[in-house]
């Protein structure tokens, strides 16, 4: 990869965006940024708290500002986005115009397995989280596909294997 372009990871919660993103950034000697972590840092509060106080709409406004800022003002970063970031047309436009978008795909079964004990997932704090995951997938998967330059299935693969595959596929894009 001669020129360092921005790499944006999109996909559902539990797809491995943060874990794979860190691995990928390390392998490419690039900076890794997690948009959810930046939102929490700037707000001085957890995403759970933001959802409780401002609702999902308030959180999405914060997310839109942060994604615009991070994608506009940086070059050569690996950015892990929140699972719902693609709900915003502005975010989809910014991501697809300012870097290579990698859709990390995973099954609802694998998502459920990876997220069932995680209490920091406000959308899953419900009686039937699997049903919520299925509804979210139905709504969001077409949006991930719409902006993806590359789609990779992450079930049953280590972060290192997926990151290596991403590097190979990006090299083939250029």
From Swiss-Prot:
Biological or metabolic pathway of the protein: Metabolic intermediate biosynthesis; chorismate biosynthesis; chorismate from D-erythrose 4-phosphate and phosphoenolpyruvate: step 5/7
Binding site for Mg(2+): 18
Gene Ontology MF terms in the entry: ATP binding; magnesium ion binding; shikimate kinase activity
Cellular component aspect of the GO annotation: cytosol
GO BP term (any one): chorismate biosynthetic process
Keyword Repressor: no
Record key words, sorted: Amino-acid biosynthesis, Aromatic amino acid biosynthesis, ATP-binding, Cytoplasm, Kinase, Magnesium, Metal-binding, Nucleotide-binding, Transferase
Cofactor binding description: Binds 1 Mg(2+) ion per subunit.
Subcellular localization(s) per the UniProt record: Cytoplasm
First-listed, main subcellular location of the protein, grouped into a coarse class: cytoplasm
Keyword tRNA processing: no
Gene3D superfamilies: P-loop containing nucleotide triphosphate hydrolases
Residue numbers binding substrate: 36, 60, 83, 140
Needed cofactors: Mg(2+)
Binding site for ATP: 14-19, 121, 157
InterPro entries, A to Z: P-loop_NTPase, Shikimate/glucono_kinase, Shikimate_kinase/TSH1, Shikimate_kinase_CS
Reactions it catalyzes: shikimate + ATP = 3-phosphoshikimate + ADP + H(+)
Pfam families noted in UniProt: SKI
Listed EC numbers: 2.7.1.71
Catalytic EC class: transferase
UniProt function note: Catalyzes the specific phosphorylation of the 3-hydroxyl group of shikimic acid using ATP as a cosubstrate.
Record note on quaternary structure: Monomer.
Family: Belongs to the shikimate kinase family.
This protein's name: Shikimate kinase
Gene: aroK
């Amino acid at each position: 990869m001669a020129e360092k372009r921005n790499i944006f990871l999109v996909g559902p919660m539990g797809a491995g965006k943060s874990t794979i993103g860190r691995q990928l950034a390390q392998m490419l000697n690039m900076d890794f940024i997690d948009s959810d972590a930046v939102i929490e840092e700037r707000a001085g509060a957890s995403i759970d708290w933001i959802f409780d106080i401002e609702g999902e709409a308030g959180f999405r406004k914060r997310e839109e500002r942060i994604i615009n800022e991070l994608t506009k003002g940086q070059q050569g970063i690996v950015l892990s986005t929140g699972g719902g970031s693609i709900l915003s047309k502005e975010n989809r436009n910014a991501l697809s115009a300012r870097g290579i978008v990698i859709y990390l795909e995973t099954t609802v079964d694998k998502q459920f397995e990876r997220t069932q004990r995680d209490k920091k997932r406000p959308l899953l704090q419900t009686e039937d989280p699997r049903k919520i995951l299925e509804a979210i997938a139905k709504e969001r998967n077409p949006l991930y596909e719409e902006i993806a330059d590359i789609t990779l299935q992450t079930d049953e693969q280590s972060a290192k294997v997926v990151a290596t595959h991403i590097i190979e596929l990006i090299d083939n894009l250029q």
